[in-house]
Structure formats: structure tokens, C-alpha cells
Amino acid sequence: MRLLFFLLITLLFAACSSTPKVHQPKHSSKTEKDLGIGLSPTPPPNERIPGEKSRAMLMEMEGREIPVRIPDANASKIDKNVSNPISIMSSSGGLLTLWALKPRNWVWGYTPIDSFEFGRAKFWRIISFSNGQVIIKNMQEGTCLQAYGNGVIHDICDSKNQAQLWNLNFFDNQAIQIQSVSAKTCLQTPTVRTTTYYSIYLTKCATSSNLDQQWYITPVALEPEPIFFIK
């Protein structure tokens, strides 16, 4: 937990003065189906707000030795254009996470300590295409990040759906700005939260120094694999 705290502090200081190299689109499409969930992120009415359970689970693990998992040589191969499992973390430490697991629900941000009970719902894979665009696929549900209204939802993956395609614009410090191909806007989350969760919005892409559109691709939070093995 101490290492995680120092990592977040390091990311925050590194983020302060970076400027993104924004992809400049030629045109945009504004048509999208009304899903009946409103246009801005709204907490799911029938879902408990996580946090306390996650913290209790972590307290129980305090002092335990976590076993190292050796990769299975017989495991199915991953396509070259598909990343290893990752976490996507904001500059303020919020991980992109599925709260309500049913497709076509909003995607949220939770800190590692508050999202432990979500399991693999906070882990993703990035699928890259030859034109530089990507799809961001959730590890637990197999659904994909999709631009919708003023925020982002997760839905059944469809590589032909422009709302599920993203450009990753790099800041000088190698953080990324996540830009929707269809909406031409970028993922943003407040740097200060007043609730357990962070709301994730789509807003005009910043072209100058900022914090709230900076995201970091990291090893899966709290369950990292070793970088290499020594026999």
C-alpha cells in the first residue's frame, strides 16, 4: 500500500506541466441512439456504493504473502495487436471501473483501495489497429468502452462502431489523452472528488497543460505480474 501511495504522488507531480499532442479530426458524427440513461453519468440506482468492503478485504490481507503466479506456457496466445491486462488511471488516482456490469451502463473511476472488491471489472486490454486507433476492452465483462452523451459507457464490442474507437494522444510526460473518434472529445475526470467514485466525462480536448485529461496505462492495480523471471 505504501508503494501504491508513492506511485500516485509521483504521477501527480509528473503530470503538472504536460501538453498533449491532440489528434486533429477531419469530420465528426453526432448521431447516437438514446439508451434511456440520460446524457451525463448518473450512479446506478440499484447498486451499492463500494468502498468499505474493499478496505476491509485489504485489511484482512495485511501481512499475508502474495504468491507469485508463473505464466502458463500452455495458455492461449494473445494476438500481437492486443495488450496484456492493464489498469487505466487518472492523474488523481481513479481507475476506470465498471460499477453496474450490465452493458450500456456508465463507466466510473475508483481508487485502487476502494475498487478492490470489483475484481477484474477494473482491468482492461487495449486492441490496436493499423491506423493508430484503439478499442478498450474490459477484462471481466468483455464489453468495450464507448462514447455516449457527456460520458462513457460499456457495451458489446463492435470494431465498426465509431463510438468505441479511440485515439491515444501522448503528453510530454508520456501520460495519454483518450480521444473519442466519433465525438472528437476527450475523457476527463475531476482532480478532486467529493464522493467515493469519480464521474467520467467527455469534454473538449485540452491543447494546453492540464491534469484532468491525463491518464496512465499501468500494470493491473494490486495484482501486478512480475516483469521477468530468474530460473
Swiss-Prot record:
<dbReference type="GO" id="GO:0030246">
    <property type="term" value="F:carbohydrate binding"/>
</dbReference>
<keyword id="KW-0732">Signal</keyword>
<feature type="region of interest" description="Mediates binding to target cells">
    <location>
        <begin position="99"/>
        <end position="110"/>
    </location>
</feature>
<keyword id="KW-0843">Virulence</keyword>
<dbReference type="GO" id="GO:0009279">
    <property type="term" value="C:cell outer membrane"/>
</dbReference>
<feature type="signal peptide">
    <location>
        <begin position="1"/>
        <end position="15"/>
    </location>
</feature>
<comment type="subunit">
    <text>Heterotrimer of 3 subunits, CdtA, CdtB and CdtC.</text>
</comment>
<keyword id="KW-0430">Lectin</keyword>
<dbReference type="InterPro" id="IPR015957">
    <property type="entry name" value="CDtoxinA"/>
</dbReference>
<keyword id="KW-0472">Membrane</keyword>
<feature type="lipid moiety-binding region" description="S-diacylglycerol cysteine">
    <location>
        <position position="16"/>
    </location>
</feature>
<keyword id="KW-0449">Lipoprotein</keyword>
<feature type="lipid moiety-binding region" description="N-palmitoyl cysteine">
    <location>
        <position position="16"/>
    </location>
</feature>
<protein>
    <recommendedName>
        <fullName>Cytolethal distending toxin subunit A</fullName>
    </recommendedName>
</protein>
<dbReference type="Pfam" id="PF03498">
    <property type="entry name" value="CDtoxinA"/>
</dbReference>
<feature type="domain" description="Ricin B-type lectin">
    <location>
        <begin position="130"/>
        <end position="217"/>
    </location>
</feature>
<keyword id="KW-0564">Palmitate</keyword>
<comment type="function">
    <text>CDTs are cytotoxins which induce cell distension, growth arrest in G2/M phase, nucleus swelling, and chromatin fragmentation in HeLa cells.</text>
</comment>
<dbReference type="InterPro" id="IPR003558">
    <property type="entry name" value="CDtoxinA/C"/>
</dbReference>
<dbReference type="InterPro" id="IPR035992">
    <property type="entry name" value="Ricin_B-like_lectins"/>
</dbReference>
<keyword id="KW-0998">Cell outer membrane</keyword>
<feature type="region of interest" description="Disordered">
    <location>
        <begin position="20"/>
        <end position="51"/>
    </location>
</feature>
<dbReference type="GO" id="GO:0090729">
    <property type="term" value="F:toxin activity"/>
</dbReference>
<keyword id="KW-0800">Toxin</keyword>
